[in-house]
Design a protein with these regions (language model features):
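Transmembrane helix-loop junctions at the membrane interface of multipass transporters and ion channels
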Residues: 39-44, 251-265, 459-460
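Helix-loop boundary elements of multi-pass alpha-helical membrane proteins
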Residues: 1-11
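Cleavable N-terminal signal peptides of Sec/SRP-targeted secreted and luminal proteins
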Residues: 9-21
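Large intracellular
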Residues: 36-230, 265-428
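Short hydrophobic alpha-helical membrane-entry/anchor segments
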Residues: 25-29, 67, 71, 258, ...
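Low-complexity, Pro/Ser/Thr-rich intrinsically disordered segments
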Residues: 19, 24-27, 34-42
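Hydrophobic, aromatic-rich alpha-helical transmembrane segments
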Residues: 4-5, 44-57, 234-238, 242, ...
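Bilayer-spanning, highly hydrophobic alpha-helical transmembrane segments
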Residues: 211, 233-254, 434-458
């Protein structure tokens, strides 16, 4: 399939060619050329050398400035600006048909989250393997005090309300023993729920939807995550603009000096051209050296390796920490199971275990049905199961610290990410720039060209 040439590059090239042709036509025209030559000859024929010497420093400033702008446009604004033009935002793009901009990461938070989830589930973690690290007895012992209180209240309230004759007809000692037995068996209920969950976690947890939803609803967390993971690379991008800009500026200075001396009328387009080149190339080179080469290469005794890939161990540690802090933690996992894609399946899992628990707590199901009737028994059972399920969100938070430690998601992600091949590890940060890097590069070129125009008319015209 033939790759389409990026529209941003095509537009920039057409604009530059059109401007150059217009300028050439104007200078070729007798009147236009005469006006330009008269202007140049009317000025002091000897341009101070310090003005030429400023060119590399201005180029360094352009390189730094365009790179800073590129980074700002990557992360901000979090929402489309201006807001009144949001209706015209191109779907899946950071820009709008009528203008405006939204940071690349905020505009594609969902897509980037999908890429990272695919990386995690295919290369780093198996969610079923992770959940097998839970110990049902330990989980139950932590949550049991909360569940005992709930169980006592549920049984006393429901049986007294739904079967008052049966309940009040029982001796007080029997009632207390029945409630005590239910409370004692609540730990077993929790163990059964966790054991069932460990076996069927694929059916009740949609990890990708969870992470993508969290990313879309918390764009600031996604931005902060990428900023912290790639902090040193972003500093490199900013500073490299100075170094590369200065180097390109030295070439620009030499070329412009001779052109200005021998064909001064050509200077009007030369500085904007070099400005475009500096802005374009500093962004281009900075983005390339971060991710290329993926594997270390020796060239003339020097080892070349992508700046980001050199920090694989350090980045893996930071990524794993932030991933658990913002996304893959016990609180979010339970929230997804209870209210997410497969919430009906999770509810069914809890209910079947709660129903077994109720039958055990009652003692003789047959006797109970004979006394209060099968229909009433089922009605009471359904009510109690409903209340047990409704109590889960209030009781389970006490186990989050234990679960986070037992699941060990942070440690697992860190250790396995540190061992990833370079081509896989590169996918952690590169998607931030990959799809829209050409837009950032062209913006750098346009800003550089505008600086070149200002530089020419302020210093040399």
């Amino acid at each position: 399939m033939r790759r389409r040439f990026p529209r941003a590059v095509t537009l920039a090239a057409m604009t530059y060619v059109a401007a150059t042709l217009a300028l050439a036509r104007w200078t070729d025209d007798d009147d236009g050329a005469t006006r330009l030559r008269r202007r140049l000859l009317a000025a002091d024929s000897t341009t101070p050398l310090w003005r030429y010497a400023l060119i590399p420093f201005i180029a360094a400033a352009v390189g730094w400035g365009t790179n800073v702008v590129a980074l700002k446009m990557t992360f901000y604004p979090l929402e489309f600006f201006p807001g009144f033009l949001r209706f015209a935002q191109v779907k899946g793009q950071p820009f709008g048909a009528l203008g405006g901009w939204q940071g690349i990461i905020p505009s594609k938070a969902g897509e980037m989250a999908e890429i990272l989830v695919d990386l995690m589930t295919k290369k780093l973690i198996d969610i079923k393997e992770i959940f097998t690290r839970l110990e049902p007895k330990t989980f139950a012992s932590i949550m049991d005090p909360e569940m005992r209180c709930v169980t006592e209240d549920i049984f006393e309230t429901v049986l007294a309300r739904e079967a008052p004759t049966f309940w009040q007809g029982l001796p007080r000692v029997v009632r207390e023993e029945m409630v005590a037995e239910a409370m004692a068996q609540s730990s077993g209920l929790l163990e059964d729920i966790i054991a069932d969950l460990m076996e069927n976690v694929y059916d009740v947890l949609d990890l990708k939807t969870m992470v993508v939803t969290l990313a879309v609803n918390n764009k600031d967390k996604v931005v902060n995550m990428f900023r912290e993971v790639g902090a040193k690379e972003f500093v490199f991008i900013e500073r490299s603009g100075i170094y590369f800009g200065f180097a390109f500026g030295l070439v620009q200075m030499v070329v412009f000096y001779f052109v200005d001396k021998h064909a001064p009328e050509q200077g009007v387009w030369l500085l904007p051209f070099f400005g475009f080149a500096v802005g374009y190339l500093t962004n281009f080179v900075a983005l390339k050296v971060i991710f290329q080469p993926i594997e270390p290469k020796r060239v003339c005794g020097v080892t070349l390796h992508g700046v980001f890939l050199r920090r694989q161990n350090e980045v893996s540690e930071e990524f794993a920490r932030l991933n658990q802090l913002h996304f893959c933690n016990a609180e979010n996992l339970w929230e997804e199971m209870m209210n997410g894609t497969y919430k009906e399946k999770f509810e069914a899992l809890v209910r079947r275990n709660a129903e077994n628990f109720f039958d055990k707590a009652i003692g003789s199901v047959t006797t109970a049905k004979l006394i209060i009737g099968a229909e009433k028994y089922d009605e009471i059972k359904c009510t109690i199961v409903d209340m047990i399920f409704a109590s889960i969100p209030d009781c389970v938070p006490v186990t989050y610290d234990y679960q986070n430690e037992a699941l060990g998601i942070e440690d697992t992600v860190r250790e396995r990410m540190q061992k990833l091949p370079g081509k896989d590890f590169e996918r952690v940060l590169h998607p931030v720039f990959e799809q829209d890097e050409i837009k950032l590069i062209v913006v750098g070129g346009v800003l550089g060209a505008l600086t070149g125009v200002a530089q020419y008319f302020l210093a040399f015209a």
